[in-house]
Amino acid sequence: MRAVRVVRHARPAEAIEVRDDVPIPDVEPGGVRIAVTAASLNFGDIARCRGGVASVMASPPFTLGMDVCGIVEAAGAGAEEWIGRRVVGITNQSLGGMAEYALAPATGVFEAPAALDDVESAAFTLPFHTGYLALHRRARLQVGETLLVVGGASALGTAIIQLGVAAGARVVALAGGPEKGEVCLGLGAELAIDYTTEDVFDRVMTHTGGHGADVVCDLIGGERTETIWTCVAHDGRYVPIGFNDDPQSGLTGKPLRKVSMGNFSVVGVVLGYSTVPLDYRRFGLNPFPPHVGPEVHAALTALVDAGSIRPVIGRRISMAEVAAALEDHDQRRTTGRSVVDLTLAGPGAAR
């Protein structure tokens, strides 16, 4: 089969090759094999190319791709109910999606929303499930609270803005540049702050009358973390979801005394629906139980059907364009989600 392969650890442009000789993977018990129609790009793909982050290490050669849309064409024992259904899926070990066939555990497979096409559906699962878990299961966002989204024009940021607006929150977005700010405002944010040129603390405090943000979803991390902490309200919740600025550091080296001084909570979240062995727990992985996934997906599908949320598609690309697209992601030259459309043959091909 055809697939986007990492053949060596390096930057995406040097790590990736599109190969036509990759074996079709065998379906496993409790899992499904999806005939993929579309697969999304993620910042995590960049880390996998480089091979520098322990939590996402894989030995080349391997296939990229964390979330997909397609038709289930085979299923292992216990997952037969999915055969023939149009689904979205989170792939096994968050790998293998950018291929003609991909494997996913049944706990990570859901009905594709009927109101979304395949490219939109592939762009839907990871950011909207993560955003919903962050806002409603972990941060407990309330109507009328102020939500600050750091990295608002990203795939996850655009999802969280829409979810915040749908929940009745006042949304403030941080984005890098006026064009990205316009994207955030178009999704319902009350205020877009250009963190490359503006004083973030002053803008947030002026907008909230000195209160600060009740919930902060930080999708970037890194050098701006301490500034963002000063924007959190008393009894607020700071949710570090992404570490795109420095994926290896996160909160490492940050003076956590400032968390105590600020009287706010740091609230973790990671997307995953499974029961993991204690050996996994020893390394810090503690996902949501399997029954939570269908509950979240049903709530999100209802919001799609109501017209309240929709994935922002930045680019529809072919497999041949993945390496260049990931380079652009790495340099913050994108907005929304970039999605591999498997009906596209190559650069510039028509749908």
How would you label these PLM feature ranges?
Residues 1, 298-316, 323-351:
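C-terminal capping/lid region of NAD(P)-dependent oxidoreductase domains
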Residues 12-13, 21-69, 78:
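N-terminal glycine-rich beta->alpha transition that marks the start or flank
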Residues 35, 47, 88-151:
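NAD(P)H dinucleotide-binding glycine-rich loop of Rossmann-like/cofactor-binding domains
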Residues 49, 53, 69-93, 115:
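A glycine-/small-residue-rich N-terminal strand-loop-strand element
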Residues 86, 146, 170, 236-237, ...:
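Short glycine-centered segments of the SAM/dcSAM-binding site in methyltransferase folds
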Residues 124-198:
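Mid-domain Rossmann-like dinucleotide-binding core that forms the NAD(H)/NADP(H) cofactor-binding site
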Residues 199-209:
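Short amphipathic alpha-helix with an adjacent loop that forms part of the alpha/beta core around
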Residues 223-306, 343-351:
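Glycine-rich phosphate-binding loop and adjacent beta-alpha segment
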